[in-house]
């Protein structure tokens, strides 16, 4: 925090902007990966052919990691405040109104994704919104992708099979899609 506070910006950073940046660094950057990793495990448990394909060809992991995140969508919604009057999808929105952005819905949009409910580890392009978009794009997106690829590269290289060992227990939330408990069995 002291490094952030010591920085200067030509226009200055308001207290609200600083608090928002702190929240994004401390909390938001954690959610995608913390909830994305077990969601990716569930994707592979529910799709054994994809698991076998990734184990046979780890070079697919960069594309597969994005698909795992799109398919699971760890942060489902985010609220934004309109800064000016506008219209979205024919709906007028006044400056100051709160708008909920549904990443979960956007990541299953049939006008963007062919067969959006299908888990496809070869999906290209994959313009998912797991990390947001535009000025709110997640600063930790690259790190999260690297960590996902590293984890699954090791897990898949060290096992010959991952299978469910019980029913998962899910986090109940309108904001994040998470897993409290995920029993997994593996064969070395």
Question: Predicted regions span which residues?
Answer:
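Cytochrome P450
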Residues: 1-188
């Amino acid at each position: 925090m002291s490094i952030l506070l010591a920085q200067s910006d030509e226009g200055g950073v308001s207290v609200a902007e600083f608090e928002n940046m702190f929240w994004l660094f401390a909390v938001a950057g954690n959610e995608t990966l913390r909830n994305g990793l077990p969601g990716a495990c569930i994707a592979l448990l529910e799709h054994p052919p994809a698991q076998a394909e990734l184990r046979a060809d780890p070079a697919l992991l960069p594309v597969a990691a994005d698909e795992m995140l799109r398919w699971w969508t760890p942060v489902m919604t985010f609220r934004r405040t309109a800064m000016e009057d506008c219209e979205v999808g024919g709906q007028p929105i006044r400056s100051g109104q709160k708008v909920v952005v549904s990443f979960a819905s956007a990541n299953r949009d049939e006008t963007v994704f062919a067969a959006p409910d299908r888990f496809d580890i070869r999906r290209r392009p994959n313009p998912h919104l797991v990390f947001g978009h535009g000025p709110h794009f997640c600063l930790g997106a690259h790190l999260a992708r690297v960590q996902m690829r590293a984890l699954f590269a090791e897990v898949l290289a060290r096992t010959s099979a991952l299978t469910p060992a019980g029913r998962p227990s899910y986090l109940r939330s309108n904001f994040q899609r998470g897993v409290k408990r995920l029993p997994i069995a593996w064969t070395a």
